[in-house]
Regions:
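Short, low-complexity N-terminal intrinsically disordered segments enriched in polar/charged residues
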Residues: 11-53, 57, 150-156
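A solvent-exposed, acidic/Ser-Thr-rich amphipathic alpha-helical stretch
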Residues: 34, 48-99
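A beta-strand edge to alpha-helix "cap/lid" segment located at domain peripheries
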Residues: 38, 76-156
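Short histidine/acidic/glycine/proline-rich micro-motifs that form metal-
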Residues: 42, 65-66, 108-110
């Protein structure tokens, strides 16, 4: 099963417990990107409850890797059967409004030699739930952490 590690410069210096405590004390509600990231992190641990809550019953997406339309159950299988060890950065919001979210994140894939990729995901919402999404993946010939404000080693 694939592994997901989250890189977040916003939360650097805080333990997971401190982050949750801050949210509880401040009454902070997770925003769209936090909810999306948390949902898929939980899927990798076998917990599908949050994904089931945030996806619309009519959800459908075209998976560019397989060339088929998928529903949320298909997406769960695809994510949980990933054989590679993958570390994923915390998503950065490109654009967001009530009905749309566009994010970019980076991955380090642990092959014999590490390789890197970026992915941009565009998400449409209906009634506050994810109706569809499209993700495009770009293989990179450089380590994105060398050019951004974080590094993989802090989170591996």
């Amino acid at each position: 099963m694939g592994r997901l590690r989250v890189v977040s410069k916003q939360l650097r210096g805080y333990t997971a417990i401190e982050v949750e405590l801050r949210k509880a004390v401040l009454g902070a509600k997770m925003n769209k990107v936090e909810t999306y990231q948390k949902a898929w992190s939980l899927v990798l641990k076998g917990d599908f409850a949050l994904v089931d809550q945030i996806y619309h019953p009519e959800y459908r997406s075209f998976d560019l890797r397989t060339g088929i339309y998928t529903n949320i159950d298909d997406d769960k299988v695809i994510v949980t059967t990933e054989n590679e060890e993958i570390f994923t950065s915390y998503p950065e919001v490109i654009y967001e409004n009530d009905d749309f979210l566009c994010i970019i994140a980076y991955q380090k894939v642990a092959d014999p030699e590490p390789r890197f990729r970026s992915f941009i995901t565009a998400i449409n919402y209906k009634d506050g739930q994810i109706l569809n999404q499209k993700t495009t993946v770009q293989e990179l010939d450089f380590d994105p952490s060398e050019h951004l404000d974080w590094n993989w080693e802090d989170y591996e």
